Amino acid sequence: MPERFKWEETERPQSLNSRVKEAFHSPASLKPRLELAISRTEAQAQRLDQTAQRLSERDKSLFAKIIEAYSKHDAQRANVLASELAEIRKTQKTVMHARLALEQIVLRLKTVTELGDMVGALAPIVGVLRTIKGSIVGVLPDAGKELEQIGTMLNGIIMDAGQTTGLTLNFDTANEDARSILTEAATVAEQKMKDQFPELPSVMPVSANKAEGKT
């Protein structure tokens, strides 16, 4: 975070009504709220990192078991394990996508140095958080709930900044920016998955005799 926000550099005499309003909507009051949002977002990114690490370890374990089953010509076991690993990798991709999107969110939040930047900068972030929350709530319910609360906090900051500056939100631009963040994160996640994890072996046919022997 910048040590000093640009909107803090100038102070002007204010009426009593203005000072009362500032207690709720002032730029100075928005700064700690923004910093808290950054801190909470970073905490969720770390939680996703931990989840990704656990999934990666499970991935390696399953892959090794698949190779072992193939070496023993146990097609049925190999195929069952491969199906499980495929589901693990779907979850890994979801978590990685969310993690990369949160990384972009933190970077954007840390670049907000002027009050006038807030409405335009924060609006797409709220949309991204809403999408991420929907994708990971089934994997990490607590993280999904926390992201929803962060989004609510940022919405409050947007409303207060809008009241202070008189700026209005361009929803089309905000939605386009949100899609851009999510698309970029998805592209990077796809490439990282290809780079980090070996391709699953082809499904082996199970002979009728072997299948009967397993039942």
Give the predicted meaning of each segment.
Residues M1-Q50, V119-T215:
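Long C-terminal interaction segments enriched in charged/acidic composition
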Residues R54-L62:
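Extended, amphipathic, non-transmembrane alpha-helical segments
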Residues K65-A69:
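Hydrophobic side-chain positions on well-ordered alpha-helices
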Residues H73:
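Residue-level signature of catalytic and energy-coupling elements of molecular machines
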Residues R77-A78:
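Solenoid-repeat scaffolds in large eukaryotic assemblies
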Residues I88-R108:
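Amphipathic alpha-helical coiled-coil segments
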Residues L109-A121:
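A cross-kingdom feature marking charged/low-complexity
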